[in-house]
Amino acid sequence: MKFSAILIAGLLIAAPSAWAQQSPLVLPMIEPGQPMEASPLEPAPEIPDATSADELVPAAPQRQEIEAETTPAPVVVELFTSQGCNSCPPAEAYLGELAKRKDVLALSFHVDYWDYIGWKDRYADPAYTTRQRAYAKTLGDGMVYTPQIIVAGASDAVGSNRGTVDAAIKQAKTRLKMQALKIERDPASGEVSLELPEADLPVPATLWLVTYQYQNQDAIKSGENRGRKLVSFNTVRSLQKVGVWDGRASTLALNLSAQAKANNPDGCAIIANLADYGPVIAAVAFDFDEAW
């Protein structure tokens, strides 16, 4: 189901100057111990030979690295879809296959612009439509449609066109220099943080925090898919802009909104897009329960 009549496929990476000149739509920012000294009246206890002094002092809680569900640098594949589009189920099934791969971070963004034709998609959010339109502007064709897949923020294809998408994934691995990200959790405070490495970036990158559910099934009662049971994989339930990375090594505290938690997500991901909606140069996915 197309919103425009033109389709341009293939990997496209804009020059840094082009990214810097882009003015895409912008989503609103969502937001020990020491041993005691012995008394002068009592001799200090002797430490047995087999015991080190460090063993007598309780260790401070150590930050725990959260194990990522994907490889350090997965290729991000974003499907823009709708329960109101009868062309989307094959693309959803394909995304389910991609979601099983360790070298890919597959996400399903449900858009809202087909809600008017008979069925309101309960996973749709205007923010996801904004993201798709911004990608269209960055890629240069201004076109949005469903099912549309964006690979690594650098190329688009019809979501059910497996050959084109597979080729774009392979190209992304060779043409984009992906950065490894690390998520850590402080057991004492419960704070979740993102460790950003030093990287040579042509322009600053926007950091997006995404939550998603692994699998959903819904009975569609009206619209183009009336009478069908549709399955969606890695269904995005929230999208937050959490910071900007200028290439310097740093640590960023991650705070998830109460609304995002209320959606009972299964997984979380951090995606770094150059200049808001340019190529994805870093990503990491992790289990929601390990962090929050």
Where do the PLM segments sit?
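Sec-dependent N-terminal signal peptides
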Residues: 1-23
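Ligand-binding face of N-terminal immunoglobulin V-set domains in extracellular IgSF glycoproteins
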Residues: 149
